[in-house]
């Protein structure tokens, strides 16, 4: 049975499950919102997301209240729930589709998706959907960034940065061959390595891996070892 793992005071995740295949679901608590990375495909993932508390954060109503805290009347502001979908494969986003179809009720406010995942999800009622084609950042008590990432595995993939952690989903994995060898695209892999090197976080988090978290250097070293096997006039590298 999947279990909930705490990475820091602000970050926890529900581990991957296999029947059905359901990716790790990450929850990052900002000062004003939960930032949820992927939604999985199983009922336990729905329960995990729905159980994230919207406990109000107290803020002072005015600058005058800031200067006189004893007389300040706090304003209760419930936490928002923002979902970031890494890519369009069903083990990462099925529960959003199930929500849209009325099969389950998923508690969230805004959905951030890449172009391909946006097409899979389709139109949404009573929820905001934002299609991400360029990096967007938020100061939410911690640094939050949602950014497209070049990869061989799935078009339109997104990563989520939360301070010193970057959640990559399946972006470092090859394109699945479905009966033929899995492969990396040479040009895209080169772009990905360059981008990953430019990122500040030192903790790289890969879906479906035991323990989830890897050192930045080890992930880049592995990808560079794959890239080193490229052959002249060949567009792909067998994984």
Region roles according to the model:
Residues 24, 47-48, 95, 215-219:
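Residues at alpha-helix caps and immediate loop-helix transition turns in enzyme cores, especially N-
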Residues 43-138:
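Active-site HxH/HxHxD metal-binding segment of metal-dependent hydrolases
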Residues 238-239:
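C-terminal regulatory/interaction regions
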Residues 16-17, 127, 148-151:
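Short Gly/Pro-enriched turn/cap motifs at secondary-structure boundaries
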Residues 20-22, 130-132, 154:
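Residues that act as N-cap/strand-start positions at coil-to-secondary-structure junctions
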Residues 2-53, 158-173:
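Conserved beta-strand hairpin/beta-sheet module of binuclear metal-dependent hydrolase folds
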Residues 34-36, 41-43, 143, 147-228:
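Metallo-beta-lactamase
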């Amino acid at each position: 049975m999947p279990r909930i793992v705490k990475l820091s005071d602000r970050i926890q995740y529900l581990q991957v499950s296999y029947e059905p295949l359901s990716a790790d679901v990450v929850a990052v608590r900002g000062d004003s919102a939960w930032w949820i990375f992927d939604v999985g495909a199983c009922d336990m993932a729905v329960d995990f997301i729905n159980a994230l508390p919207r406990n109000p954060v107290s803020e002072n109503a005015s600058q005058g209240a800031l200067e006189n805290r004893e007389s300040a009347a706090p304003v209760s502001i419930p936490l928002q729930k923002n979902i970031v979908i890494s890519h369009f494969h069903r083990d990462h986003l099925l529960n959003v589709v199930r929500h849209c179809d009325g099969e389950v009720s998923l508690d969230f406010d805004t959905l951030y998706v890449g172009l391909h995942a946006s097409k899979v999800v389709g139109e949404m009622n009573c929820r905001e959907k934002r299609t991400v084609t360029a990096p967007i950042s938020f100061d939410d008590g911690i640094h939050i960034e949602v950014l497209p990432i070049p990869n061989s595995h799935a078009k339109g993939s997104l990563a989520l940065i939360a301070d010193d952690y970057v959640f990559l989903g399946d972006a470092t994995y090859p394109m699945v061959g479905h009966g033929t060898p899995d492969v990396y695209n040479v040009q895209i892999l080169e772009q990905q390595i360059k981008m990953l090197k430019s990122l500040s976080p030192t903790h790289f988090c890969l879906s479906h891996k035991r323990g989830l978290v890897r050192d930045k250097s080890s992930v880049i070293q592995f990808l560079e070892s794959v890239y080193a096997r490229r052959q002249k006039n060949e567009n792909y590298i067998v994984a």
